[in-house]
Amino acid sequence: MWNMALLPGGIDACAIMPAMASLEKDAPAGAAAAAATPLALEFCGLKFASPIVLLSGCVGFGEEYTRIEGFSNRDAGAIVLKGTTGAARLGNPPHRVYETPAGMLNAIGLQNPGVDHVVRVILPQLDFSETRFIANVSGSTIEEYVEVTRRFDASPIDAIEINISCPNVKEGGVAFGNYPDMSAQVVAACRRVTNKPLITKLSPNQTDIRENARRCIEAGTDALAVINTIMGMAIDVEERRPVIGNVQGGLSGPAIKPIALLKVHQVYEVAGPHRIPIIGQGGITTARDALEFIIAGATAVGVGTALFYDPLVCRRINEGIAAYLAAHGLADVTELVGTLRTAKDLADCALSG
């Protein structure tokens, strides 16, 4: 059933059916599919059949949602695997997840089987013909980041995302990503051990995300993911205790979308001149949301929390983006990236006209 609410301006669905043909479940993935649709793009040299990226922690290691009828990994341009550390981790004590108004708090604690198991057991089970798979690297020390990155570099994974929001145990537990110097050190160290596309996931929990982006670019990142979750908490007033076992958790979902959108715009001001692509993420649930992020400067858009209540949301977002492109006479989605018109842009147009 076509959801016209997801199509900006009530666009006629029939206008985009040819454009969506290659996104059907049985269509070929990879470069062939990418060449056939206006949703296709190139991201760090990789062919994406869609601008949608499924975010780390929301689809396990890329196979969980394939058990749902109607779901297909082909609806996403790429899938980011669950955060992986050097050794296996059990994660945080319960409760780990809590629903909030227009969002969700989570504090999973990087539960994962460790990089050796992921590389030897999980990666061989993935169908790399369906979509691109991106590893998510986490660590408590720079040395751990480097070792996990090195292991993924020798694997069939398509790209590597660095989660720099992890606490640095050598510096009292402060998050690497909250400080430009620490962020740059992690990126530079990982850059030295891989030739695969390197994506740095920026934290919003910092003073100046633009400076952090600039330092990560100088350190060698190929792309930026903006933003990670925003730290928050919830309290059980009867027990007078935190609801989340870890006290605090990461807030995601529609509640953070305006913040994420601003951060993407700010990072694009730094990354755009260097042609560093951005994965914009934070509260995307509809095609209109995705379009806002693309206009703000994102080349690709991340979908995460929305998958928990609508596993088929990616297909609907793809349909809505394609409809918008058709209605506005745009040949492909890349023509829309960074086309935000600010008051300054309008003033410049008036002066030059």
Language-model region placement:
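Short, charged, surface-exposed secondary-structure boundary motifs
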Residues: 88-92, 234-236, 311-314
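Hydrophobic faces of well-ordered beta-strands that scaffold small-molecule active sites
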Residues: 52-55, 77-81, 133-137, 160-162, ...
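Alpha/beta enzyme core
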Residues: 140-279, 288-292, 296
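Flexible loop residues that form catalytic
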Residues: 57, 84, 165-167, 229, ...
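Short, surface-exposed connector motifs at secondary-structure boundaries
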Residues: 48-51, 127-133, 192-198, 270-275, ...
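Conserved strand-to-helix beginnings and helix N-cap segments that scaffold or border functional pockets
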Residues: 65-66, 145-146, 210, 311-315
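Alpha/beta catalytic cores of nucleotide-metabolism and tRNA/nucleoside-modifying enzymes
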Residues: 2-4, 10, 17-36, 251-276, ...
